[in-house]
Amino acid sequence: ALSSAASDVYKRQVVGILVEDQNSIYGLEHLKNANLIHICIMYVGLLLAYMKIKQKGYFWEKVNNGDLYIPEKLFEKVACVAVLFVLFQFSFQGHMILSGVDRGIVRSSIGVWGPLTTYVGRFGMPALLSLSTVLYFYIYDHSKKINRQYVIVVICGILVAIMAGGKANIVMMFLPVILQCGGFLKKRYLVTFVLFGALSIVIVGMFQMNMSFAQSVSYNIYRATSLSNMGTLCVWDKFPTGDPQAYMSLLIGLGERIISFLFDVDRHSVEFLKFSLPRYITYLYYGNAQGAIDGVVNLTITSFGEAVYWFGRKFYFIASLIFAFVLYKISIWVFKTRKKDYLLKNVIVSVFFTSLCLGWLNSTSGCFLSYFFGFTSLVYLFGTYMLIKYVLKGSSLNK
């Protein structure tokens, strides 16, 4: 049998449970209340943004073909690029994902192609979907050719999302579509999207983990509830007063390889983990220390976990207020660019919101600044800008 001390160590390493004061695990009641307060503060930011957007009337308006001529070749170009993305994703990553190789192993094995597959899955393809959705839903007349090409773009989006490997990738891929045309769609279509997204998560889980349908449903419920909260629980336990070295997470925005070069630290070493909060917490608590070192396993840490990481249990709300303000400004920014003359800017901002902002709320790297404005994020956004500029080249939309 394990001794009492050994038992405590085992609990900390494997399941992240530490009874600090013999009264509560993680200070559970305080944790739940703090998390609820954090969520409420964030929702207030969104509510204020919605009120501002509605007051100013920041919405897309229908565009007559006579007012703004959109040639069919524009949709044809979007569809061609989307097909190329599918072929690229399959060649470098998709064939392994579809054959059942774990996503973490795929991510660590494709080397220099990794950033490009990430770009296609998280930025390039969502940008094409965002652009084509605006063009499709806010033009009065559609030809059969445009209808067919829009369907091709949507199908390509589904295929790229599946080959990205994540179970929620299809949902994340089509968030720009819902963002652009959500007010235009009838409720039954929105419900259909939610059901389709949930079903896709289950089906992808079946193929990835060789599970039955029922097993995949059960696992994904567990993954979306207990396991997704574990990283935040561990941050709450590990940093009751915040981490004095939290500023180190600012550097992760440079990218792991650049950090490794600048500081002469192997990115697959224990010493490197101080730069990556998710990998560090995974190393300490998850029970797969080598997986954390190799970068193939990560616990999810939410924006609330980031707030605790920086300010501790007592003053986390300072970060919550900052995050709510950031969310407020970005949300308004997305809708404020909904003008025909700002189409390029709107697509970039929309992808920034869905791929970076919403992604950060659910899974932080340790600092939203490095997540939003890190070197890799800026490169991806610049690549997206060049992509959409190329697609719009020669069109009256590109002003």
What are these regions (language model features)?
Residues 37-57, 125-136, 176, 377-392:
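Hydrophobic cores of alpha-helical transmembrane segments in multi-pass inner/ER membrane proteins
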Residues 52-188, 197-214, 362, 369, ...:
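Membrane-embedded catalytic interface detector for glycan/lipid assembly enzymes
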Residues 1-6, 10:
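Single conserved hydrophobic/aromatic residue that forms the stacking wall/gate
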Residues 150-152, 171, 194, 317-318, ...:
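Hydrophobic alpha-helical transmembrane segments
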Residues 19-37, 112-115:
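Membrane-interface segments at the starts/ends of alpha-helical transmembrane spans
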Residues 14-26, 94-96, 360-364:
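Juxtamembrane "helix-exit" motif on the non-cytosolic side of transmembrane helices
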Residues 299-399:
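Hydrophobic alpha-helical segments
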Residues 108-117, 205-323:
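Small-residue-enriched transmembrane helix-hairpin modules in multi-pass membrane proteins
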